[in-house]
Structures are given as structure tokens and as C-alpha cells.
């Protein structure tokens, strides 16, 4: 079939071309009139035209040559007023408008880090074309990355998978990989899909980045970093540069991470992830004033970005917690939670941080239990319509930490019953953690260690998962050497947060002291006393004890 002007214009818009040339030949009394027009692809406005006449069929070819020459001249004049557009995304949809919205969504998330805008644009695209598989896939990914509405995210990724047979090979592999990763929790099959994408194009930046994520989840950070860097070399996006940054932080390569952060600020100044990375580096380096400076800078730079406002405050709350300023941490966390509530995020009503600071830092088990029970009465999980959006597993961890194994298991069982189609792999790590905490509270310390080692096997990409609990089990079993080794492993492993740092300082000091290792005891007493120098009054008795023992050791050692 002949290529019509309207179809040619749509193809040009998809490919980022400025204009198309439309032409026709009309017979008039034995002669022929040849007309060519240069038309803007974006809006159909005629930019230039020319006409030539051929007296008979023998003159048609020479007339075409003359017409071509004149049009070339006029194209040169007209194109100075045209702007060049980037090609639209090469994905399957019947709607040019939906494709434009999808392409805008990619720009929002890849170069501005604006997931909220991307989600809105993708929703608009899907209203226009409900069978737009790539938009469904991307919507699911962004909802997951933003930790929003797991039920919607799962539905979106599943819908993309259901539409995969109408897609190009590249799109089909992307839809399959997302489904295997986010719905089936089958990383091996996701890896295969991304590798097939690389068979199609070894420089596919999306495949390289996403395969890096899989390797990172499997604990192979070096391989992940290599893939991210190959992806950035093809096409720099804030997502992949952010993945490089966070991987370097997890690897403890803070100077290189800082270089990635500086590049992120330069290339993507509105992307919140680089502020987060800079705060994580400062926290790892124990630069607590730096965390405050960066969080304040983030709030000032991104005043209308509600996720940025919430995230900055959660970091400030953790920073206050680390220094024993629990009342300040609670107040800041309440501010952060209000942003979550404004965004409509499930779980924004629950005082997660207050529970853990009450139980772990204040060591007030009764008040922690009272708080937990009050949360569930004031905000019943059943009030959250979608079972998959209910934070049941967060409550499982709380009940487990309190030693209520029955309630912890009940949370897992209720969640599994509410979402029966979820693969067993989704629950394996939570079950291992629940079994481990139950064993600790039952005094079965070796069983607890086995369960938390299983957790580490199930979560190889988590730097520190299970470290504290394994150390605690050894500690309660009276195995000081093993407890010290695991507490130090927990303390010294690079991470993206460090809520236990003061507790580790305090307990390591006590363990070394008990072994007669006064040099290391003094070191950790000093670090603890310094960190909690301005702690709340309710914590100062512990600081006083540690300071007194530190001074005693110094006197003993001369």
C-alpha cells in the first residue's frame, strides 16, 4: 500500500524527524504537473512547496530532477526554523498520543528522577491505549520503585506479561523479565530474558542495567557494577548512575561513590536519589553534621517533591536516633509520616520507628508491645483494601522481636492466605527470620543461628541481613568471641543505614571488657560516649556508666 502523508508524519514523529516530503503527479491535457511539499511532522504545517511541469511522459524524469533540486534548496531555508526532537520510544502502541506520554514518562524518571510525574503520565497513556503493554510494565516498575501500592504494581506487571505476544522481541523480553522478577520472584528466568535482550543488542542499556540489578540481588556487586557502567557508557540515565552510586556505597568505595554523586548532581540536579546517596556516604563515615546539611539542602532544592521531603526527614530521624536524641527523632519521623499520608501510601499511619526505638534503644518491652497493639487497634490492617498492600510482614518482625512467635507466625499466615497466588519464594526469607527470632526467645540459639544463616542464603544481596541476630544468639549463648566477631561484622560492613551503631558500640565495649581486652573496651566505650554525648536524659545513665568505666580503664592503664 502507498505511504499516506498522515502515516508518514506519524512515523517521522516516532523517529524524531523534523519533516516529511509529500508529492503528487497530476495529468492535465496530456501534460503533467508535479508538486512537492515539505510538511512539518509535528503539526502538518506546510513549510515549502514547488511545482514543475512535464509536457509529456518523456519529460517526467527530468521534471522530477528539477523538482528535487528546488525542494532541496527550500528545505535548507525552512529547516533553520525547525527544532529537532528526540525520537519517541520504540515500543508497540496504536496511539501516537499514548506513545508521546510514555516517552515523556521515560524522560521524567530517567533524567529528572520524578517517579510521581512518570506514574501520572503512564496512567494517562493507558487511558488512551489500555493494551499498551510497555506502559503497563513501566507503571509496575515505577510503583514498585516508589514503594507504592504493591497490588497495583503486581497487576500492572502481570498485565504487560499477558500482552507480551503482540510485542517486538525486545519488549517481550522486558515484559517477561519484569514478571519473573516482581511477580514470580524467579531471578534465574529474569536473567535469561535480559541475556536474550543482549543477544539482540549487546549494547542495550536497559538490559545491561536490569541484569546488573539481578546480579546485585544475588550478591555479586562487582558484576553488577560492571554492567551498570556498560549501561551508562551507552546512555547515561539517573537510574543507572544511581545504581552505580548505591553499589559503590555497599562496597565501601566511598570516594568513587562521591564521584558518582557529583556527576548525578551535575547531570540530574532535580533527582532526589543523589541527595540520598550523599547522606548515606556521610552516615557511613559517621559525619552526622553532614547528614543534617545534606538533608536541609535536599529540602530547600526540592520543595515541591513530597517523596524528597519525606525521605530527607526519615534520614534526619535516623541521624537523631543514632545520637540518642529519641524525642527529636520521633517528632521528625511524624513529619515524614504526614508526607506519606498526603501521598496516600499504605502504612503511612504506623509508628514504625517509634516501636523500634522503644524496644531496642529504650529497652522497654512493655511499652513497645502497648504501642504495637495500639497501632493495630487504631489502624486495622483490614482497613487497607488490597491485602498485598498491608504491611503484615512489618508487624511480623515486630511481634517476633517481642518474642511473640505465635502472633508473628499469624501475620505471615494471614498474609499468605490473603494472597494465595503468591509464590512460596516470596515468604521464605520472612519465614526464616520469624523462625530465627522464635528460636532466640525459646533459648534455642544454635537453631536461631541456622535460621538466620538461611536468611542470608535467601537474601545474598543484603549486606548485613541476619548479622545482628546471629551475634545476639552467640551473645545469649555465652559465646563472647563469636558474638564479638558477628557484632563487628555488622558494625564494619558498609550499608545504606545503621540503626544499631550505638548499641553495637555499647555491647562490644562490654564484651571486650569482660574478656579483659581493655584496649578494645576503651575504644568502644569512647565511641559510645562520644556518639551519645548529647543523648536524651533518659539515656544518660548508660552514658554515665560507660564514661565512668572508660575513665577507670584509662587510670588502670596509666
What do these predicted ranges mean?
Residues 99-100, 134, 171-172, 206, ...:
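Start-of-helix register in tetratricopeptide repeats
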Residues 144, 149-150, 154-165, 488, ...:
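TPR/TPR-like (Sel1-like) alpha-helical repeat modules
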Residues 138, 210, 243-244, 277, ...:
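Canonical tetratricopeptide repeat
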Residues 110-111, 145-146, 182-183, 217, ...:
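Register position in tetratricopeptide repeats
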Residues 106-113, 140-149, 180-185, 219, ...:
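Short coil/turn linking the two alpha-helices of tandem helical-hairpin repeats
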Residues 142, 179, 214, 247, ...:
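TPR/TPR-like alpha-solenoid repeats
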Residues 161-166, 195-200, 232-235, 262-270, ...:
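Solenoid-like repeat scaffolds
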Residues 1-274, 278-281, 285-296, 304, ...:
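Acidic, proline/glycine-rich low-complexity intrinsically disordered segments
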